[in-house]
Amino acid sequence: GCYAQYVPFQAENLLKLPDAVSAEQVASLELAMCVQVSFSQLAKLAAVQGKRVGIGGLGPAGLVALQMAQAYGAAQVIAIDPVPARRELALQLGADLAVAPDDPYWSAERDDPYALDSALDCSGLKVSIEALMARTKEVVAIFGVLREDVAFGWDHWRRGLKLLGYERHNRTAAEQALQLIVQGQLDLTPLATHTLPLTRYAEGVELLRSKQAIKVRFLPWA
């Protein structure tokens, strides 16, 4: 959102919503579009369908990503986050397993039967990305905004691990994300854990900073 009642856009940059889709259902469509870009990249490498996919970081992007992994045919989706409430929400949204980063089950190295086939990091944190790289057999994609350099070394190279950056978001990705919503394969409404009038913007920001909220939906005219 733009934290305003009205925002001008070029008409060609807008998507018309189907009559059956509400504004609440697509309030986070821009985020879903961005996550879709990463899944389009993974799909080109056949890294989702039939694979054991890990999602690192269960903020809004991670909660979108785990649903997309299911929609695109992942055999199993493993959600990783240190916050219990976010792991619980991930399970409600369909993750097969939700674990803390220090969970022994999650500590499997890449040669372990429980290792991941592919993974998507949604945190941008070095510790998360490198943990995924150590536990993934084929591909690790980085969606989260990278905050510091990560180490891709000889061990990753010798076993053929692929590390993907992020491509530009685009209209096609937005249309694909919208189609997942229409088909009932992507539910964005649980991301908005709080709803406030726009006049209480500062309160909403504090809820986000303190991690009491995942996303805050502001009502422009309330």
Where are these regions (language model features)?
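Glycine-rich phosphate/adenylate-binding loop and adjacent beta-alpha elements
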Residues: G1-L15
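N-terminal Rossmann-like NAD(P) cofactor-binding module of classical short-chain dehydrogenase/reductase
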Residues: D117-L120, A141
